[in-house]
C-alpha cells in the first residue's frame, strides 16, 4: 500500500486521524464525511494513494468497485433513502479538493435534503453525426490502449 505523506486520507488510513469507519478491507476504507450533506454521507477511498480515476490499475479498480455497491446497499437498507447519489471529482477544475481518489455516497431524502446537482445540457449543440464522431474517437482511443 502506497500512501502520500501529507494526504489527509492517507493519515486516516494510517490511524493518525480518527474517522467514523463504515467499512474496511485490505484495499478499501469507507468512513462518514465529517461534513454530512445528508445522514449517512460516506466517503469510499482506495487504501493505495491515487489522485484520480485515471490512475486506477485494472486490479485496484476491481477491488475498489467491488466494495462500493456493498456499502451503498448497506446505507440504503439502514436509512431507507428515496435515492442515492454517487459522486466523484477528478481535478481541481472539476471540484476535487482532496487529491486522493474518493467517491461520495450521498443518500437522498427529498427536497431540501441539502444536496443539489444541477448541470446544463447541450443537446441542441450536437447533431447525431457529431455524437457518432465523438463516440468513434473515444472508441478508437480505447482500442489503442
Swiss-Prot record:
GO molecular function: catalytic activity
Transmembrane residue ranges: none
GO biological process annotation, one example: nucleotide metabolic process
Motif (Histidine triad motif): 100-104
Entry-linked InterPro entries: HINT, Histidine_triad_CS, Histidine_triad_HIT, HIT-like, HIT-like_sf
Pfam families associated with the record: HIT
Domain HIT per the UniProt entry, residue ranges: 8-116
The protein, known as: Protein hit
Native organism: Bacillus subtilis (strain 168)
